[in-house]
């Protein structure tokens, strides 16, 4: 059904090589928008054989100084009218990056996706991660310039990266106040809304808050304490006093991107 995650029904069937098998599919739509989809998973292979299925990836990882692994999803998994039933990467990609990491721990992961992905193992083990989103036909150039230092990244996440689906309410209940989005989520996310890194560091100081009638003016100073020029995105969030109503935990009220040498 379109108003909830897909139901994944599995059955174990023994198949013999060289034989043809007939598959009977019974489908019933009792109302609303419903669809069925069949998936095929290749027989389990040894992990090393699985690496070989990806061409020369395993060999290249052994020979290079640093491995850049591009992972993610595309419109075959998530698009308008089709939602994912899990926040994780496809199982073969999870196995792939684990094996690549064993071969060469100096690995960079580039994520390609249009939404958040639960990359818990990658976060714990891979030393560098860059989220490329869906970058377009010049995306490779943009990623390369960021990785090789020609461009110092300064982007910030426009959404929350959760650890798992267990942290979210049922898919068919999109009541935001039940823990959805950074405004109402009370747990500790994998990456929070507004999170982002660069090749330099910044320091905030001299915070001054002045109130005049219904207007609040906030001023502060930002200095670049690192070795490289870079962009910082200053963000101002507000929290509401107890009012008896279920107000957001916090809300973004202002932000500005500034380049600091």
Spans of model-derived segments:
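Intrinsically disordered, low-complexity Pro/Gly/Ser/Thr-rich segments with frequent PxxP/GP/PP motifs
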Residues: 244-261
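Secreted, periplasmic, or luminal enzymes acting at the cell surface/secretory milieu
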Residues: 112-231, 237-241
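Solvent-exposed, conformationally flexible loop/turn segments
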Residues: 18, 213, 260-261
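Aromatic-lined ligand-binding clefts that engage carbohydrates, nucleic acids, or primary amines
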Residues: 23, 236-237
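Extended hydrophobic-aromatic, low-complexity segments
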Residues: 34-36, 78-80, 119-121, 228-233, ...
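Hydrophobic helix-and-loop "lid/oligomerization" segment in the mid-to-C-terminal part
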Residues: 48-124
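Acidic/polar, compositionally biased interaction segments
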Residues: 1-66, 81-83, 88-92, 247
